[in-house]
């Protein structure tokens, strides 16, 4: 089966645009491989698209070492799908963005991972070795559970860097 017949839904929450920027860059990368990508904010979720997608990527900012309440609401709203095992066997991944270099982003990825596991999804981590510490380096935060990004206190047009 070709990649062009596969679909990916990226569901994210972004209060100030920084996490939306990360979601958009992930979508652009996936589209380059020929995968059909659906990008949606948690406040405008198309449940049918999520149900039909081959893979789901969830993302949100790190707030106080936890997921955003908007993503938590989506998780709770998925209860009927959990009971029906609708997403069982789908690939899943997660990402988070925050102002601090750590800010307990790992806890956010663990929460997203646990949500995916509850649904019987197959988790895909980040396979990239850390390459350095500059804002342009791949996996500069040495995360393997999922993508961690950091934004300075500036507009989403400036930070995080692509």
Q: Which residues make up each language-model segment?
A:
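Short, local alpha-helical segments
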Residues: 95-97, 151-155
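Alpha-helix boundary/capping detector
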Residues: 56, 76-79, 83, 100, ...
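Mobile gating loops/cap/lid regions near enzyme active sites that modulate substrate access
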Residues: 141-150
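Gly/Ser/Thr-rich helix-start
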Residues: 18, 60, 66, 99, ...
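N-terminal beta1-alpha1-beta2 submodule of the flavodoxin-like/Rossmannoid cofactor-binding fold
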Residues: 1-87, 136, 153-161
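Short, glycine-/small-residue-rich phosphate/pyrophosphate-handling segment
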Residues: 91-141
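Short, intrinsically disordered/low-complexity patches at protein termini
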Residues: 75, 89, 126-127, 148
């Amino acid at each position: 089966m070709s990649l062009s017949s596969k679909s990916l839904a990226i569901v994210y929450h972004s209060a100030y645009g920084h996490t939306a920027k990360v979601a958009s860059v992930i979508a652009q990368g996936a589209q380059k491989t020929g995968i059909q990508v659906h990008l949606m904010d948690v406040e405008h979720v198309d449940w049918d698209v999520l149900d039909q997608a081959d893979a789901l990527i969830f993302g949100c900012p790190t707030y106080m070492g936890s997921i955003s309440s908007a993503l938590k609401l989506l998780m709770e709203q998925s209860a009927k799908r959990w009971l029906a095992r609708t997403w069982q066997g789908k690939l899943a991944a997660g990402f988070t963005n925050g102002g601090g270099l750590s800010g307990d982003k790992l806890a956010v990825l663990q929460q997203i991972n646990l949500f995916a596991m509850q649904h019987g999804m197959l988790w895909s981590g980040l396979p990239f070795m850390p390459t350095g510490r500059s804002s342009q380096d791949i996996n500069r935060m040495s995360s393997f559970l999922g993508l961690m990004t950091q934004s300075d206190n500036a507009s989403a047009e400036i930070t995080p860097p692509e």
